[in-house]
Regions:
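Compositionally biased, intrinsically disordered low-complexity regions
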Residues: 5, 52-55, 109, 123
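An N-terminal hydrophobic leader/cap segment in hydrolases
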Residues: 13-60
Length: 124
């Protein structure tokens, strides 16, 4: 009958949609690291990014990874900003922000996450 044919087609559509959803969910789970982090691995010194009076430091972590950070001193009586750059780009892309902090007399410490801007390791 026609009703049975429609029912059979609807069941196949629901099964296909469910399996497609499951497959896409599994794919997203297994590649989520690549969908979340977009590390810019290039290491640029502050001067090459147009910054003056900014020192580059390399800090070794207890698990022997190296983290690159930039440090600009504050003028007397002014605050120092601890700035984390987010999950895209690297330190050089934040140079205008550091320059703004300096123009206000503020200090800045900006660290490259693992896997970004010359820091070793990988983000997690």
């Amino acid at each position: 009958m026609v009703g049975d044919d429609v029912r059979e087609v609807l069941i196949k559509i629901v099964i296909f949609a469910g399996l497609s959803y499951l497959g896409l969910s599994l794919l997203a789970y297994f590649v989520q690291h690549r969908l979340t982090y977009f590390p810019d691995t290039s290491r640029i010194v502050p001067e090459a990014a147009g910054l003056r009076g900014v020192a580059e430091w390399v800090v070794e972590t207890p698990d022997r990874e190296r983290l690159v950070l930039w440090r600009a001193d504050a003028k007397p009586g002014q605050p120092t900003i601890l700035y984390f750059h987010g999950n895209a780009a690297g330190l050089a892309n934040r140079a205008p922000r550091v320059a703004f902090f300096q123009s206000q007399g503020w200090g800045a410490v900006i660290m490259a996450y693992r896997g970004y801007a010359g820091s070793s390791g990988s983000p997690s």
